[in-house]
C-alpha cells in the first residue's frame, strides 16, 4: 500500500474559525431570546451544527490518499470512512488549479479548499476531497467523479499514466429532471413529515372540541418554560394551528428545494427532507410537553 500526502492548506483553521464564530453569535443571541420554542430550536440547531462542523474538521485533519495494485483509496476519520476507486473503473482524469469554478451543493469551501459535493463547471457532480485548491485532480469513473489534492501532483499523474489512464477533458452531460414520486425513501419521508405536521395541527383542536383542555391555557413561554401569556383554550388551539401552518410552509419550501437538489444527488434531497421532519418533530414535542404539564 502506497500512501500519498494531501496538500494541507487552511481548511481546518477556516472551518474551526466558522464554528467558533457561530457558537459565539449563538451565545450572544441566547441572552436576548426569551421565547422557549425559538430557543429550543436554536439549541438543537447549534448541536447539529457543531456535529457537522466536527465531522468536517476531522475530515480535513485526517484525510489521506493511498493505492495498491487494484484500487485508489481516499481515507478519513482515521480510516473509519473510506472511498474505494477501482482502477478498472477509471475512465480519465483532469487537472485544475486555483478556485473551484462551480456551485457547492453540500459541504465546505470553494476558494481555498473543497470538501463535500460540488457541481464543477465542465467536469460534473464531484465528490470533493480537496484540502487545498492549488492543484486538484479530478478522477472520472463509470458513475462518479472524485476530486483530490495531493501534495505531489506529478506523483499521482505518473502512476495514473502507468495504468494507461489519460489526461483529457470530457463532456459534462447534465442529468434529466429526476422524478422522486416513485422513490420509496422519499415517499416515506413525505408520509412521516405529513403525519407529524397533521398531529401538530389537529391534536389541539381535538382536545379543545372534546373539552379536555382547561379553559385557561398558556399561549407563550419564557426560556425556562414558564408561562408569560395566558388565553382561552380556543385561542390555544388556533395558535397551535398556526404552528402547523408554519410547518407546512417550511415543508413545501424544502419539498421543492429537494426536487432541485435531486438533479444532482438524491442523498442531498433526503437530507433536506430530514430538516423539515426535525423542525416539525420539535414542535410536536413542545406540544406534548404542554399537554403533560397543563392538561390533567
UniProtKB/Swiss-Prot annotation:
**Keywords, sorted A to Z:** Cell membrane, Membrane, Transmembrane, Transmembrane helix
Q: Which domain of life is it from?
A: Bacteria
Where mainly found? membrane
Residue ranges annotated as coiled coil are none
Q: What is the protein's given name?
A: Uncharacterized protein CA_C1301
Kindly list the places in or outside the cell where this protein is found, as annotated in its UniProt entry: Cell membrane
Protein topology in the membrane: Multi-pass membrane protein
Q: Which GO terms describe its cellular component?
A: plasma membrane
On whether Transport is a keyword of this UniProt record, the answer is: no
- Residue ranges of the TM segments: 10-29, 36-58, 112-131, 188-210, 241-260, 273-295
**Species the sequence originates in:** Clostridium acetobutylicum (strain ATCC 824 / DSM 792 / JCM 1419 / IAM 19013 / LMG 5710 / NBRC 13948 / NRRL B-527 / VKM B-1787 / 2291 / W)
Amino acid at each position: 500500500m502506497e500512501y500519498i500526502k494531501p496538500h494541507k492548506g487552511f481548511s481546518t483553521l477556516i472551518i474551526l474559525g466558522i464554528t467558533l464564530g457561530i457558537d459565539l453569535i449563538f451565545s450572544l443571541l441566547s441572552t436576548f431570546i426569551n421565547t422557549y420554542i425559538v430557543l429550543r430550536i436554536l439549541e438543537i440547531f447549534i448541536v447539529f451544527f457543531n456535529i457537522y462542523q466536527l465531522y468536517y474538521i476531522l475530515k480535513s485533519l485526517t484525510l489521506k490518499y493511498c493505492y495498491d495494485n487494484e484500487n485508489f483509496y481516499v481515507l478519513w476519520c482515521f480510516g473509519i470512512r473510506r472511498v474505494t476507486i477501482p482502477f478498472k473503473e477509471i475512465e480519465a482524469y483532469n487537472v485544475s488549479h486555483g478556485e473551484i469554478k462551480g456551485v457547492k451543493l453540500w459541504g465546505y469551501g470553494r476558494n481555498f479548499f473543497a470538501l463535500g459535493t460540488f457541481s464543477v463547471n465542465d467536469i460534473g457532480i464531484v465528490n470533493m476531497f480537496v484540502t487545498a485548491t492549488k492543484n486538484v485532480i479530478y478522477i472520472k469513473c463509470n458513475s462518479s467523479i472524485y476530486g483530490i489534492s495531493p501534495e505531489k501532483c506529478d506523483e499521482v499523474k505518473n502512476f495514473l499514466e502507468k495504468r494507461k489512464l489519460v489526461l483529457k477533458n470530457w463532456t459534462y452531460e447534465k442529468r434529466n429532471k429526476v422524478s422522486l414520486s416513485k422513490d420509496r425513501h422519499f415517499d416515506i419521508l413525505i408520509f412521516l413529515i405529513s403525519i407529524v405536521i397533521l398531529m401538530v395541527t389537529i391534536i389541539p383542536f381535538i382536545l379543545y372540541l372534546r373539552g379536555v383542555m382547561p379553559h385557561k391555557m398558556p399561549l407563550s413561554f419564557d426560556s425556562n418554560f414558564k408561562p408569560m401569556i395566558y388565553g382561552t383554550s380556543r385561542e390555544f388551539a388556533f395558535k397551535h394551528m398556526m404552528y402547523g401552518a408554519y410547518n407546512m410552509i417550511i415543508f413545501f419550501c424544502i419539498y421543492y428545494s429537494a426536487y432541485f437538489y435531486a438533479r444532482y444527488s438524491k442523498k442531498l434531497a433526503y437530507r433536506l427532507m430530514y430538516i423539515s421532519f426535525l423542525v416539525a418533530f420539535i414542535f410536536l414535542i413542545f406540544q406534548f410537553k404542554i399537554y403533560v404539564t397543563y392538561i390533567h
